[in-house]
């Protein structure tokens, strides 16, 4: 991108020879200052960060009964460091690596939201439109026409649709129903929209159906073409490919009687678009980079900056505060799927994921473009990962030349 800017400037200087040389030199100097500032904002001194961060990672694994974790740090538009700890398979003593595959859970939800908002940018719907107006094969049941469920409600967990999950062992005979069949039988609100925040996997199964309906492309194919491929998420999939199976971690839960870690079954679910997705921390880092850089990854844009800013803005002030009591401070709340908050004057985005022996977390500082991604095969380890993520970002801020790139609002 910078090469393109310099080439353009040289062409303009050649084309307009009559213009003041001093003026053109002024423009060039300003551009160089801009480049220097951006580069400085993305520099993190890992020699200072890692001696403090790595012991914290080890303590987190111990405190959270987490067999293994793969971790990545992001600054600007790059992964600046990655490492892995513990064993992805305790019985085989298989060391985890940055290429170990885990289930990423609900961290996938924001990817599905991007897919839906891509359709919004094509003019297919507006955020505050009634969803039922776009459903032809079935409807959201129990809806009060005076208080209709909108697209914004779906993306903020305020629709009144229930949580739902419906898990089955991955090697069992039970096959999850198609999106159409599941939604036709299950899509019913339990309360009016905006009554409260109720984390809803069913809502995001409907989001997947809507992406498919608007685009005319099967949902899994659409996600592959419009999210995974442009972001070079080559080891992320709804079902692990053979090469991913070779790197797949075993999910573990803690035996309540003995305190020991036990392998548990991987699951499939009726609401699989809500987070039954597998990936690596390196792929998660690419996703986080796109969200910290205005919707672009290596000059490939997946969403406009204006739409992404909507995603990263808290939507309903009445629901500010902790996200279901587990993350954030008094400013925290849902954007369009992403969790958002302001801490120490900086704006943050975050999301976790947890399914049957796996816990994942993503945290990004929007104003300094710093990010932390972690995938684990520990069960319900959220509080430990949240503390570790905050520590990692704080250390990167402390040991960097990262000047604030924008002002929190």
Positions of PLM-derived features:
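N-terminal secretory signal peptides that target proteins for export/translocation
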Residues: 1-20
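Bacterial N-terminal signal peptides
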Residues: 25-36
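Sec/Tat signal peptide C-region and signal peptidase I cleavage site
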Residues: 37-41
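Catalytic loop of the DD-peptidase/beta-lactamase superfamily, centered on the K-T-G motif
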Residues: 42-83, 212-225, 229, 262-409
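A short, well-structured edge-of-sheet supersecondary motif
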Residues: 62-95, 127, 169-176, 234, ...
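Active-site-proximal loop and beta-strand segments within enzyme catalytic domains
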Residues: 63, 90-201, 217, 242-266
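Short, solvent-exposed loop/turn and secondary-structure capping segments
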Residues: 82-85, 164-170, 224, 238-241, ...
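Well-ordered alpha-helical segments within folded domains of soluble proteins
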Residues: 112-113, 203-208, 285-286
């Amino acid at each position: 991108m910078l090469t393109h800017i310099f080439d353009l400037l040289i062409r303009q200087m050649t084309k307009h020879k009559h213009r003041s040389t001093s003026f053109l030199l002024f423009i060039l100097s300003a551009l160089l200052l801009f480049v220097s500032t951006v580069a400085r904002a993305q520099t993190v001194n890992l020699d200072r960060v890692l001696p403090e961060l790595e012991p914290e990672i080890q303590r987190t694994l111990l405190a959270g009964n987490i067999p293994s974790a793969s971790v990545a740090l992001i600054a600007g538009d790059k992964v600046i460091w990655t490492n892995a700890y513990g064993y992805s398979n305790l019985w085989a003593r298989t060391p985890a690596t940055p290429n170990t595959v885990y289930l990423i859970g609900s961290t996938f939800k924001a990817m599905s939201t991007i897919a839906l908002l891509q359709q919004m940018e094509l003019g297919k719907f507006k955020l505050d439109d009634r969803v039922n107006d776009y459903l032809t094969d079935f409807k959201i049941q129990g809806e009060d026409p005076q208080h209709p469920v909108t697209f914004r409600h779906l993306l903020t967990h305020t629709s009144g649709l229930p949580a739902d999950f419906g898990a089955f062992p991955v090697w069992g005979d039970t096959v999850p129903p198609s999106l159409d069949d599941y939604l036709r039988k299950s899509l019913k609100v339990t309360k009016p929209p905006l009554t409260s925040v109720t984390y809803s996997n069913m809502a995001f199964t409907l989001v997947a159906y809507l992406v498919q309906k608007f685009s005319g492309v099967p949902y899994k194919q659409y996600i592959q073409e419009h999210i995974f491929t442009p972001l070079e998420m080559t080891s992320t999939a709804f079902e692990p490919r053979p090469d991913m199976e070779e790197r797949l971690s075993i999910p573990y839960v803690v035996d309540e009687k003995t305190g020991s870690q036990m392998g548990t079954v991987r699951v499939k679910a009726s609401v699989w678009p809500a987070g039954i997705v597998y990936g690596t921390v390196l792929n998660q880092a690419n996703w986080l980079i796109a969200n910290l850089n205005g919707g672009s990854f290596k000059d490939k844009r997946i969403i406009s900056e204006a739409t992404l800013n909507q995603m990263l803005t808290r939507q309903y002030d009445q629901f500010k505060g902790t996200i279901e009591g587990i993350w954030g401070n008094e400013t925290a709340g849902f954007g369009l799927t992403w969790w958002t908050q302001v801490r120490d004057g900086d704006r943050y985005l975050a999301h976790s994921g947890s399914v049957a022996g796996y816990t994942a977390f993503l945290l990004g500082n929007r104003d300094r473009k710093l990010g932390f991604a972690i995938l684990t095969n520990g069960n319900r380890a959220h509080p430990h990962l949240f503390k570790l993520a905050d520590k990692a970002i704080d250390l990167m801020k402390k040991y960097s030349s990262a000047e604030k790139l924008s002002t929190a609002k």
